[in-house]
Amino acid sequence: MKFGMYYNKETIGDVLLVIYKSDVIPAYVKQRNDIVALFDKDNEIVGYNFLNISNSMKIKAHGQIPICSHQVIDILNCMLKNASFPLLDYLDESGFKVGQIVEMEEHPDSDHLHILKVDIKKDRLLNIVCGSFNAKVGLKAVVATENCFMPSGKQIIPEEVMGVFSEGMLCSGRELNIDGYENKKGLYILDDSYNVGDDFYTLY
């Protein structure tokens, strides 16, 4: 199951957050040792809070951790196993793909939305509704794919946008929390050194 992982000691303390469902308010929690497990009303895991995590590992992140080593997951799973909580899958892929716009048409019911066909080297093109002013055919950008987690904690869920199905999101530098892009609008444009279909965070 996909999850988001976050750590920022300055803002939330020495706590590693793991989020499975960003749109679900936990119904109850269970704490065992330094792990707080959050559950929904159906008794399914919503996420984990690993307290005092620096006692177990050193983390340099200041926000989202899009991918991490098997060693990190193995340490966390050892802690979860000792607390009798469900284990984590390896976080080998971030869900942020290098994509290229191959088709573009204007949304019939909007003066700024575009309907895009985006290639991420999947078995088919993705249909994505996008409002960025600099979107154009041929442009390479970062695609947040289905169920991946943004730096903000938001999970990307396929949905209809003004009547048109959208199954992902093309990202701005600000949405990706890239330094220097805090106040810049428009898609974060990738050059030809990026290959379509690659994981953005194995390259960035």
Outline where the language-model segments fall.
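Phosphate-backbone binding interfaces of nucleic-acid-interacting proteins
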Residues: M1-Y204
